[in-house]
């Protein structure tokens, strides 16, 4: 039987956390969030680094938000990307802190899909 790598274990944990967080969202938010895909990367992909995304970013929302008037006309789907090795490093290798930060980062990026700006995140403890 093949062994699970540390990366696979982290990705499995993150998938479970995102699934649980989505299920716990209030109904209207949960319905809206169903349109958002989630991508788990080790680190920030090169093409985003070339676009100016910081290499130590924990997550990123891309695509149209709910505030975009022409969101239904966009060819790009809403996407939350989580950079799991960056999150793990940020948490100093602490597994419990990793779980909490995956949840927090997912909610932060989902907030951008819902139309929240960075200043809107702090009162929700998502900054």
Residue ranges of model-derived segments:
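Short hydrophobic/aromatic patches at helix-to-coil boundaries
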Residues: 124-127
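Short alpha-helical catalytic segment bearing the HExxH-like zincin motif
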Residues: 101-109
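Active-site rim/adjacent substrate-binding subdomains
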Residues: 1-101, 113, 117-122
């Amino acid at each position: 039987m093949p062994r699970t790598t540390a990366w696979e274990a982290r990705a499995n944990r993150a998938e479970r956390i995102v699934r649980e967080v989505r299920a716990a969202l209030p109904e209207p938010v949960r319905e809206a969030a169903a349109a958002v895909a989630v991508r788990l990367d080790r680190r920030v992909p090169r093409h985003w680094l070339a676009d100016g995304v910081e290499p130590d970013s924990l997550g990123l929302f891309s695509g149209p938000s709910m505030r975009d008037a022409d969101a239904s006309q966009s060819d790009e789907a809403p996407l939350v990307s989580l950079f799991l090795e960056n999150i793990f490093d940020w948490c100093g290798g602490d597994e419990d802190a990793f779980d909490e930060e995956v949840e927090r980062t997912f909610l932060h990026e989902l907030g951008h899909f819902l139309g929240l700006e960075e200043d809107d995140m702090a009162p929700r403890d998502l900054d």
